[in-house]
Swiss-Prot record:
E.C. number: 2.8.4.4
Domain MTTase N-terminal as annotated: residue spans: 6-116
Compartmental location: Cytoplasm
Any Gene Ontology CC annotation: cytosol
Domain Radical SAM core, chain residue ranges per copy: 133-370
Protein family membership: Belongs to the methylthiotransferase family. RimO subfamily.
Protein name: Ribosomal protein uS12 methylthiotransferase RimO
Cofactor: binding details: Binds 2 [4Fe-4S] clusters. One cluster is coordinated with 3 cysteines and an exchangeable S-adenosyl-L-methionine.
Keyword field: 4Fe-4S, Cytoplasm, Iron, Iron-sulfur, Metal-binding, S-adenosyl-L-methionine, Transferase
UniProt function note: Catalyzes the methylthiolation of an aspartic acid residue of ribosomal protein uS12.
Domain TRAM: 373-441
Main location as per UniProt: cytoplasm
Gene it is expressed from: rimO
SMART domains, per the entry: Elp3 (SM00729)
Amino acid sequence: MSQLNPKVGFVSLGCPKALVDSERILTQLRSEGYDIVPSYDSADVVVVNTCGFIDSAVTESLDAIGEAMNQNGKVIVTGCLGKRPEQIREAYPNVLAVSGPQDYQSVMEAVHEALPPKHDPFVDLVPDYGIKLTPRHYAYLKISEGCNHKCSFCIIPSMRGKLVSRPVDEVLREAERLVRGGVRELLVVSQDTSAYGVDVKYAEKMWRNKAYQTRLKALCEGLSELDAWVRMHYVYPYPHVDEVVPLMAENRILPYLDIPFQHASPRILRLMKRPGAVEKTLERVQNWRRIAPDITVRSTFIVGFPGETEAEFEELLSFLDEAQLDRVGAFAYSPVEGATANDLPDAVPEEVKQERLARFMEKQAQISAARLEAKIGTVQQCLVDAIEGDIAVARSKADAPEIDGLVHIQNADQVPLRVGEFVDVEITESDEHDLYGDALPAATRPAFDLKML
């Protein structure tokens, strides 16, 4: 082995099960090119796998941590005593990281942070953030699979199964790797983002030496620690969604909610098996805007659902007038094989569905145009997606890729810009979809953060 390999010291305490945990960690360390050394003074960092079963084991573990701190100073603690991180940090506040038993990934993340593995061009063919099909500067972050709802127009549960939430620490570590690899925007997706953690009873996990619940608000709080935009998609309108809006007001995550309301008629919503308290929905949208005045609310709707009357469609148009949503997508109802809505009576004729869809989109186009026009004269922080000659295409905080509008920067030949760069743009024009403006000179906007590249 080359003397240039990073060196890890290892102390394993406790029962045979803990010994197996140590073996797994050591195996991973060796597979990544770390040398395992027998003494504190020859180690670049020390891992202590602790026991906490009885008082004497706790004492032995704390003594081992203390010895490693005294003789080396760079110590990562894992194992059973790691389930009581406050006890460890009270005795040794300067340990690098603390994790519980079987949390191999946290140990490896802590080692990587303290002592990055040596780059091997013959082995490191895949970046640690994986292979992505999106541009380098944004990425989708999937937090769960499946869905527990039984919306009558949808067959997702039969295709993808019931809700299965990813552990919050796993999600946060993936997000951290993505940002470290140059991602500037994280787009949180799932079938039902609001239900995150319900299936695991909001289990608590450790990340960066702090406990996080597997829950939407806690996830947002963790993601807000990263130097990137965080955008929430597919948010089912549960009451606890209100908890994340203050984080938007504090600029910790983007003031943006993609929340599918689907309709505004209580009867149609019941037929869809969706929440039906439209008055409360309007109150909530108004309250979100009081808390976070810059919030963008995007939604999707279905027109021509079986049994929809002209009066109920008019209710939907009235809802658009009152809600003044920023971005809206709509679909004419189309039967999906296996959906229970197919069995509902009073199917709406195709020509009526298309006529209603056109009226719906015309109404929303007027609303969107007015809301965009109100931004003329403002300065919007934007993320540059593409540069073509003297025109750059970017997105503001209000614009998700592919589904929302764009910001056309018209002086890209006069101001140095790069794809994936944040830039402040003074808005000069608008239409019903997009904004147009000029990038401000670098001296008048925040410096580009090179650490993200």
